[in-house]
Amino acid sequence: MAIERTLSIIKPDAVAKNVIGQIYSRFEKAGLKIISAKMCHLSKPQAEKFYAVHKDRPFYPDLVKFMTQGPVMIQVLEGENAIVKNREIMGATNPKEALPGTIRADFADSIDANAVHGSDGPETAKEEIAFFFKPDEIF
Protein backbone atom coordinates (compact mmCIF):
# COMPACT_ATOMS: atom_id res chain seq x y z
CA MET A 1 0.00 0.00 0.00
CA ALA A 2 1.21 3.46 -0.88
CA ILE A 3 1.85 6.22 1.63
CA GLU A 4 0.03 9.27 0.29
CA ARG A 5 -0.58 12.86 1.26
CA THR A 6 -3.87 14.67 0.93
CA LEU A 7 -5.18 18.13 1.73
CA SER A 8 -7.98 18.55 4.22
CA ILE A 9 -9.86 21.71 5.10
CA ILE A 10 -12.13 22.04 8.09
CA LYS A 11 -14.61 24.59 6.77
CA PRO A 12 -15.97 27.70 8.56
CA ASP A 13 -19.15 25.96 9.76
CA ALA A 14 -17.22 23.21 11.57
CA VAL A 15 -14.64 25.66 12.97
CA ALA A 16 -17.51 27.76 14.37
CA LYS A 17 -18.97 24.64 16.05
CA ASN A 18 -15.64 24.07 17.83
CA VAL A 19 -15.25 20.49 16.54
CA ILE A 20 -11.68 20.73 15.18
CA GLY A 21 -10.38 18.39 17.89
CA GLN A 22 -13.10 15.82 17.27
CA ILE A 23 -12.33 15.85 13.53
CA TYR A 24 -8.58 15.55 14.19
CA SER A 25 -9.29 12.56 16.42
CA ARG A 26 -11.08 10.85 13.53
CA PHE A 27 -8.12 11.45 11.22
CA GLU A 28 -5.78 9.91 13.78
CA LYS A 29 -8.05 6.94 14.54
CA ALA A 30 -8.11 6.21 10.78
CA GLY A 31 -4.31 6.06 10.77
CA LEU A 32 -3.76 9.47 9.17
CA LYS A 33 -0.95 11.66 10.50
CA ILE A 34 -1.35 15.44 10.52
CA ILE A 35 2.01 16.53 9.11
CA SER A 36 1.23 20.23 8.71
CA ALA A 37 -1.62 22.50 9.79
CA LYS A 38 -2.60 26.15 9.83
CA MET A 39 -5.64 28.22 10.64
CA CYS A 40 -6.44 31.13 8.38
CA HIS A 41 -9.26 33.26 7.09
CA LEU A 42 -9.37 32.85 3.31
CA SER A 43 -9.59 36.02 1.27
CA LYS A 44 -12.05 36.18 -1.61
CA PRO A 45 -9.21 35.96 -4.20
CA GLN A 46 -7.73 32.92 -2.41
CA ALA A 47 -11.07 31.11 -2.32
CA GLU A 48 -11.80 32.00 -5.95
CA LYS A 49 -8.42 30.66 -7.06
CA PHE A 50 -8.59 27.50 -4.92
CA TYR A 51 -12.07 26.61 -6.18
CA ALA A 52 -11.47 27.84 -9.78
CA VAL A 53 -12.28 24.34 -11.07
CA HIS A 54 -15.92 25.10 -10.12
CA LYS A 55 -15.95 28.61 -11.65
CA ASP A 56 -18.65 27.81 -14.21
CA ARG A 57 -20.89 25.93 -11.78
CA PRO A 58 -23.99 27.67 -10.39
CA PHE A 59 -22.90 27.13 -6.77
CA TYR A 60 -19.47 28.82 -7.22
CA PRO A 61 -20.37 32.31 -5.89
CA ASP A 62 -22.03 30.83 -2.79
CA LEU A 63 -19.08 28.48 -2.22
CA VAL A 64 -16.61 31.38 -2.32
CA LYS A 65 -18.81 33.44 0.02
CA PHE A 66 -19.16 30.52 2.45
CA MET A 67 -15.44 29.71 2.49
CA THR A 68 -14.58 33.34 3.32
CA GLN A 69 -17.17 33.85 6.08
CA GLY A 70 -14.88 32.70 8.88
CA PRO A 71 -11.62 30.93 9.67
CA VAL A 72 -10.76 27.52 8.28
CA MET A 73 -8.31 24.89 9.50
CA ILE A 74 -6.11 23.53 6.70
CA GLN A 75 -4.01 20.43 7.14
CA VAL A 76 -1.91 17.94 5.22
CA LEU A 77 -2.70 14.34 6.10
CA GLU A 78 -0.35 11.44 5.43
CA GLY A 79 -0.87 7.69 5.56
CA GLU A 80 -1.59 4.55 3.60
CA ASN A 81 -4.19 5.36 0.94
CA ALA A 82 -4.70 8.73 2.63
CA ILE A 83 -6.86 10.18 -0.16
CA VAL A 84 -9.46 7.40 -0.17
CA LYS A 85 -9.31 6.97 3.61
CA ASN A 86 -9.94 10.69 4.18
CA ARG A 87 -12.84 10.71 1.72
CA GLU A 88 -14.37 7.70 3.47
CA ILE A 89 -14.25 9.32 6.92
CA MET A 90 -15.55 12.63 5.48
CA GLY A 91 -18.67 10.96 4.05
CA ALA A 92 -20.82 11.95 1.08
CA THR A 93 -20.81 15.60 -0.03
CA ASN A 94 -24.49 15.84 0.92
CA PRO A 95 -24.64 15.10 4.66
CA LYS A 96 -28.14 13.63 4.23
CA GLU A 97 -26.52 10.89 2.13
CA ALA A 98 -23.45 10.47 4.37
CA LEU A 99 -23.11 7.24 6.33
CA PRO A 100 -23.62 7.45 10.10
CA GLY A 101 -20.38 8.10 11.95
CA THR A 102 -18.78 10.08 9.12
CA ILE A 103 -17.65 13.67 9.67
CA ARG A 104 -20.35 15.11 7.44
CA ALA A 105 -23.13 12.99 8.95
CA ASP A 106 -22.13 14.14 12.42
CA PHE A 107 -21.09 17.77 11.90
CA ALA A 108 -22.41 19.13 8.56
CA ASP A 109 -25.63 21.10 8.20
CA SER A 110 -26.21 21.01 4.44
CA ILE A 111 -24.64 20.23 1.08
CA ASP A 112 -23.21 23.78 1.15
CA ALA A 113 -22.13 23.90 4.81
CA ASN A 114 -20.66 20.40 4.72
CA ALA A 115 -17.88 20.75 7.33
CA VAL A 116 -14.84 19.50 5.39
CA HIS A 117 -12.99 19.45 2.07
CA GLY A 118 -10.66 16.70 0.94
CA SER A 119 -8.58 16.20 -2.19
CA ASP A 120 -10.23 13.85 -4.70
CA GLY A 121 -7.11 12.31 -6.27
CA PRO A 122 -3.30 12.23 -6.23
CA GLU A 123 -2.75 15.07 -8.72
CA THR A 124 -5.37 17.27 -7.08
CA ALA A 125 -3.79 16.55 -3.68
CA LYS A 126 -0.35 17.70 -4.89
CA GLU A 127 -1.81 20.90 -6.37
CA GLU A 128 -3.96 21.67 -3.32
CA ILE A 129 -1.14 21.03 -0.85
CA ALA A 130 1.18 23.31 -2.87
CA PHE A 131 -1.55 26.00 -2.92
CA PHE A 132 -1.45 26.34 0.88
CA PHE A 133 1.91 24.98 2.03
CA LYS A 134 5.56 25.51 1.12
CA PRO A 135 7.64 22.30 1.14
CA ASP A 136 9.51 23.40 4.29
CA GLU A 137 6.20 23.78 6.17
CA ILE A 138 5.42 20.07 5.88
CA PHE A 139 6.91 17.70 8.43
Swiss-Prot record:
Single Gene Ontology MF annotation: metal ion binding
Annotated InterPro entries: NDK-like_dom, NDK-like_dom_sf, Nucleoside_diP_kinase, Nucleoside_diP_kinase_AS
GO biological process: CTP biosynthetic process; GTP biosynthetic process; UTP biosynthetic process
Cofactor(s) the protein requires to work: Mg(2+)
Keyword presence, Transcription: no
Residues noted as binding ATP in the record, renumbered to the chain: K11, F59, R87, T93, R104, N114
Assigned EC number: 2.7.4.6
Catalysed conversion reaction: a 2'-deoxyribonucleoside 5'-diphosphate + ATP = a 2'-deoxyribonucleoside 5'-triphosphate + ADP; a ribonucleoside 5'-diphosphate + ATP = a ribonucleoside 5'-triphosphate + ADP
Active site per the UniProt annotation: H117
One GO location term (cellular component): cytoplasm
Localisation per UniProt entry: Cytoplasm
SUPFAM superfamilies the record matches: Nucleoside diphosphate kinase, NDK
Pfam families tied to this protein: NDK
Keyword annotations: ATP-binding, Cytoplasm, Kinase, Magnesium, Metal-binding, Nucleotide metabolism, Nucleotide-binding, Phosphoprotein, Transferase
Record's function text: Major role in the synthesis of nucleoside triphosphates other than ATP. The ATP gamma phosphate is transferred to the NDP beta phosphate via a ping-pong mechanism, using a phosphorylated active-site intermediate.
Subunit composition and interactions: Homotetramer.
NCBIfam families in UniProt: PRK00668.1
UniProt record similarity statement: Belongs to the NDK family.
UniProt protein name: Nucleoside diphosphate kinase
Native organism taxonomy: Bacteria, Pseudomonadati, Pseudomonadota, Gammaproteobacteria, Legionellales
Gene expressing this chain: ndk
